[in-house]
């Protein structure tokens, strides 16, 4: 088994031969084998860190933040409307067309603030999320506080 990387089970369990959907590609994959701490397993449960051998996708098609799921409520989006709360410690201006980073879970993507009311972001690359996920907006080039604020996805 060739393990190039590993991931964490965030909810539930995975079993050998389970069929899951890879996001953002929407490819169907099957778990051929599971490894935990160099031991082969038939099943792994949350919050285990695992290595998976997958059928239906190549290792170079998987990136940090990608998700394997059976949950149909997860969506792949390039535009987000959020309920935004600016950090009281961030003193910079927030303007339309301003670039920032958005963080949801382990995913960090570049985004442009399209409008402030309603607060809309246009992402350079797709992000995986569901309604009411918490997100963090970051201004990477800031010399003081980098966290612009947080929000919930509408």
Map each language-model feature to its residues.
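Conserved catalytic-core segments of large NTP-driven translation/proteostasis enzymes
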Residues: 4-71, 78, 82-84
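C-terminal effector modules of nucleic-acid-centric enzymes and ribosome-associated factors
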Residues: 58-154
